[in-house]
Amino acid sequence: RYIAVSWARDVYKRQELIDIMDLGCRINHKPHELSGGEKQRVAIARSLVNSPALILADEPTGNLDEDTSKHVLNYLFQAIHNFSKSIILVTHSKYVANYCNKKYDLINGILV
């Protein structure tokens, strides 16, 4: 029973991420057939599928258009808030940084 419940939950989580990242129409495509933004969304979904307590993200919206970036960031930070997750995020975008509750700058190799 426990394994079946766990498996069903995993399938649901995978499908939820496929839907959120708008990847349903690309599910059977090979990696080399995906655009840069689609590959980025796959990477984000893969990082979330096991519900990690800590997410490390380096330029998570780097290859995404503005609308997709907003959608992904809203989902990511909603999940962090709702499920008590933490994220360490590196970005050059002030827009993306504004989603974070603590911000640090790296100046000459020193965090300030």
Each predicted region: which residue ranges?
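Signature (C-motif/LSGGQ) region and adjacent switch/coupling loops
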Residues: D19, I27-K30
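Catalytic Walker B motif of ABC-type/P-loop ATPase nucleotide-binding domains
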Residues: I55-D58
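Hydrophobic anchor residue at the start of the ABC signature
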Residues: I44
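Single conserved hydrophobic/aromatic residue that forms the stacking wall/gate
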Residues: R1-A8, Y12
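A short, proline-enriched helix->beta-strand linker immediately N-terminal to the Walker B motif
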Residues: V49-A53
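Conserved catalytic loops of ABC-family nucleotide-binding domains
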Residues: Y75-L89, A97
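Conserved ABC ATPase signature
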Residues: K30-L34, E38
